[in-house]
Amino acid sequence: MRKLVYYVAVTLDGYIAGPGGEFDFYPQGDEAQAAAYMKSMNTRYPETVPTFARAGVGLTDAPNLRFDTVLMGLGSYRPGLDAGFTSPYAHLRQYVVSTTLAPDTDPAVTVVPEDPLALVRALKKEKGQDIWLCGGGLLAGALLPEIDELIIKSYPVVAGSGIPAFNGAFDPTLFKVTERTSFDNDVTVTWFTRR
């Protein structure tokens, strides 16, 4: 069965973005450190690089290694949309959970106006690669019962406030660390599976 994997960058205090959705405050380290980190993550998960950026990092023809589907909330979709990219991950099946986004925004993007849990349960039954939950926190909170794995890129910064990684009801859910890697730019990536 396919897995739902929440792959996301997080501050030390658990935020994925600032109060206005900003994420440009994440420290990258010096040029060499940032390049080494990005190369490592892009080699492992090339499909998580937006289609418009793939050529610039040498991933134009890179195959999808882990995911063939991306699921995101409107807050995660909006930055690309505002920049004119209506299909930010054209190399993946794209679903945007939103009650306000027009269903005809892009023919390659399926807008899901309700019940993301039912969607994920149906997608998991299909054949294919895993499903990447791109964000945001509200959607992750709603989908917590179906999240099988977490890949948390922990950055050495405290935001103070913003959009939490999970924004939902109190629901303690246990995960087990399966791998952890630290990079020279002080980012730590931890892989978790549901217990």
Segments from the language model and where they lie:
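Enzymes that bind and transform nitrogen-containing heteroaromatic metabolites
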Residues: M1-R195
